[in-house]
Amino acid sequence: MALTLEALVARFGGEIVGDGRREVGGLAPLDQAGPQHLAFLANPKYLAQVETTAAGAVLIAPRDLEKLGAAANGRNFIITPNPYAYFARVAQMFIDLAAPQRAAGVHPSATIDPAAQVAASAVIGPHVSVEAGAVIGERVQLDANVFVGRGTRIGDDSHLYPNVTIYHGCTLGPRAIVHSGAVIGSDGFGFAPDFVGEGDARTGAWVKIPQVGGVKVGPDVEIGANTTIDRGAMADTVIDECVKIDNLVQIGHNCRIGAYTVIAGCAGIAGSTTIGKHCMIGGAVGVAGHVTLGDYVIVTAKSGVSKSLPKAGIYTSAFPAVEHGDWNKSAALVRNLDKLRDRIKALETALAAREGDAGGA
C-alpha cells in the first residue's frame, strides 16, 4: 500500500519540501532505495548518499538539509527533528498495514481453564495453555505453545510469540511484546546455606528459599527471545513502563528496572538490584546483586558493575580488543605491577633520603 507524503505528514507531523503528492510504499536505505521508497538520514556522515539516492523522498533533519544546499533541488524531503524515530514509526505503520488480520477466537487445540477470563477479541493460537484465574485482555495475541499460569494477567493489545512461558501470579501491562522462548516468573536463585564442618568433613545442604513474589511488567515493554525474568522472593520483581530488553538477558529476583531503560543482549542483572530510569546497559554487562544504578546511567558492553553507580554518566570496565601480541605484553606488565610498585617506593624513599642529606649539608 502506497501513501503520499502529505498523508504521512498528516499522521506523523513534519514539513514537506518538494512534491507532497509523491507516493511511497516502503522504506529502504539511502544507497538501496528506489523511487517507490522512503529513505532516511540519521547520521550526517552519510550526507553524500542523499545527493545520489534514487529514493522517492528522504526523512531529514533541518540542519542536514541546510548542509545539502543546491544538491537538495528537485528532491523530496520530510523535515523532522528526529528522522530515525520518524522512520521507526512509519516502518511500524507499513508492517501493520501489510500484516494479515487474524480472526479472534480460540484454536481447538488450546487448553483454557473454565476459571480463566479470555476477552472475545483475543487470538489464542494452537496448543496454548491458560490456567485458572488468568486474565487475557482485549486484542491479546497468544501464539502457538504459549503458557500462561494461574492468576496471571496479560494486558490489552499484548503479543506473546510462540513458546513464551509466563508463570503464575505475574502481570504484563498493555501492549507488551514478548518474544519466543522468554520465561517470566521462574523461581529466583535463592538458597540458604546449612553446612557444618570443614573440607571433606563438611556436611549439610543448600535449603531452597520459596519464591513467593511475582513479576510486574509495565505498559509498552518489549522482552527479547530467551530472556528470563525471575519472580521475587517475597516482593515482586518490577519492570517499569517502556523498558526494552534484548535477547538472552537474565534479570534476577527482586530487581527493579526503571522506566525507559534499555538492556542489550547477554546482560546479567543479579538479584535485588535497582536500575534507574533512562539507563542504557550494554551487551554482556554483568551487574552484581544489591546495588543501585541511578537515572541516566550508561554502562558500556562487557563491563562488570560491582558497586552502586548513583551518578548519571558513562561507565566502562571492559578491556577493548587489541592484537594478541600487544595483549600478552600488557598482561605481562599487569602481572608485575606489584614489583614495579615496590621498586618505585624504594626509589622514592632513596630520593627523599638523598634530598634530606643534601639539605642538611
UniProtKB/Swiss-Prot annotation:
This protein's GO CC annotations: membrane
Active site: 253 (proton acceptor)
Record field: catalytic activity: a UDP-3-O-[(3R)-3-hydroxyacyl]-alpha-D-glucosamine + a (3R)-hydroxyacyl-[ACP] = a UDP-2-N,3-O-bis[(3R)-3-hydroxyacyl]-alpha-D-glucosamine + holo-[ACP] + H(+)
Biological-process GO terms, alphabetical: lipid A biosynthetic process
InterPro entries: Hexapep, Hexapep_transf_CS, LpxD, Trimer_LpxA-like_sf, UDP_GlcNAc_AcTrfase_non-rep
Keywords: Acyltransferase, Lipid A biosynthesis, Lipid biosynthesis, Lipid metabolism, Repeat, Transferase
Gene Ontology MF terms: N-acyltransferase activity
Known EC number: 2.3.1.191
Pfam families given in the database record: Hexapep, Hexapep_2, LpxD
EC class (word): transferase
Pathway: Bacterial outer membrane biogenesis; LPS lipid A biosynthesis
Subunit structure: Homotrimer.
Entry's family note: Belongs to the transferase hexapeptide repeat family. LpxD subfamily.
Functional note: Catalyzes the N-acylation of UDP-3-O-acylglucosamine using 3-hydroxyacyl-ACP as the acyl donor. Is involved in the biosynthesis of lipid A, a phosphorylated glycolipid that anchors the lipopolysaccharide to the outer membrane of the cell.
Name by which UniProt lists this protein: UDP-3-O-acylglucosamine N-acyltransferase
Species assigned in the record: Burkholderia thailandensis (strain ATCC 700388 / DSM 13276 / CCUG 48851 / CIP 106301 / E264)
Protein encoded by which gene: lpxD
